[in-house]
Amino acid sequence: MTLRELIAQAAEAEVGVRETKTNGGKRIADYQSCTWLPVGAWPWCAAFVDFCVKSAVEKFGPVTFALPRTAGAWDLENWCRSVDDTVKLKKTKQGIATVQRGDIVIYKFSHVGIATSSLDDDGDVSTIEGNTNSAGSREGDGVYRRTRNVSQIRSIIKFTQ
């Protein structure tokens, strides 16, 4: 099984997790503990992604890159640039992107999620995102399935292992 598939499965296993207080709760603390910041009441969408990558790597086995530990959505781009070429950053141009299941999808509005599909004919991608809500906010209350249009995507991180 590919690392990308394991990342998607890790995200799917978390759907339905909800905060028990603003930006907090037992499971949210688990996500936040995957970053370099101390656990606290701070936005955790990137921490959720870090957690999913870490969970997938634990099943996949050794990888040649350092795990992401950032607490910022756009900082994941910097992490990607700092690791070896088994992790690739793809910047979108004019709304054109190639998204695959298990990719990290970084949005223009400083939010991030995990793709669970490729783009459909309308340019939409299914994702799972932490710290969102049913309306799609970047500051929400849990882990949700979302559908986003490619026009909202800033960049994509792809794993080649």
Where are these regions (language model features)?
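...with weaker cross-activation on analogous glycine-rich loops/strands in unrelated enzymes
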Residues: 3-8, 59-137
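Low-complexity, Gly/Ser/Thr/Pro-rich intrinsically disordered linker/tail segments
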Residues: 144-161
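N-terminal capping segments
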Residues: 1-64, 157-160
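Positively charged, low-complexity intrinsically disordered regions
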Residues: 28, 70, 82, 146-149
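Aromatic- and Lys/Arg-enriched surface recognition patch
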Residues: 136-145
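Glycine-rich, flexible loop/turn motifs
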Residues: 24-27, 124, 139
